[in-house]
């Protein structure tokens, strides 16, 4: 059965590129435009989500807040969460790790690298 990934990013073009890349590799993708929508879709689809991929800088709820909120929910305590963001400072990466991020990818991203990381994390 195909694995399901929640992709959260306020940039429509980034979401579309991420979704296209992942769908072409056989993954099912649920898209959300910000952390609030991402949280709602995560809760509604908790039983099928295998990975969350989130941006950091978004309106309404940023990526770190989304990660912390998801990690507080029993159904997402062990779900891999990857940050896909323009933020590349060591301080921000440490904040991401402290919040519960599994890994970090920097935009702009190479679609092949994205697939490589996703396959390593969830198969």
PLM region spans:
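Charged docking surfaces used in two-component/phosphorelay signaling
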Residues: 16-24
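Acidic, metal-coordinating helix/loop segments flanking the phosphotransfer/catalytic sites
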Residues: 31-51, 94
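Active-site residues of response regulator receiver
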Residues: 55, 85
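Receiver (REC) domain active-site loop signature in two-component systems and cognate sites
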Residues: 58
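Short, glycine/charged-rich "phosphate-handling" switch motifs in NTP-dependent
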Residues: 102
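C-terminal output helix
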Residues: 109-118
């Amino acid at each position: 059965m195909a694995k399901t990934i929640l992709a959260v990013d306020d940039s429509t073009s980034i979401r579309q590129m991420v979704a296209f890349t992942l769908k072409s590799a056989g993954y099912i993708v649920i898209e959300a435009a910000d952390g609030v929508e991402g949280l709602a879709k995560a809760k509604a689809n908790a039983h099928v989500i295998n990975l969350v991929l989130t941006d950091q800088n978004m309106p309404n709820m940023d990526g770190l807040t989304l990660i912390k909120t998801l990690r507080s929910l029993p159904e997402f305590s062990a779900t891999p969460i990857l940050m896909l963001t323009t933020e590349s400072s060591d301080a921000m990466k440490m904040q991401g790790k402290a919040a519960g991020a599994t890994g970090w990818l920097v935009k702009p991203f190479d679609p092949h690298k994205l697939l490589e990381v996703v396959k390593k994390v969830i198969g």
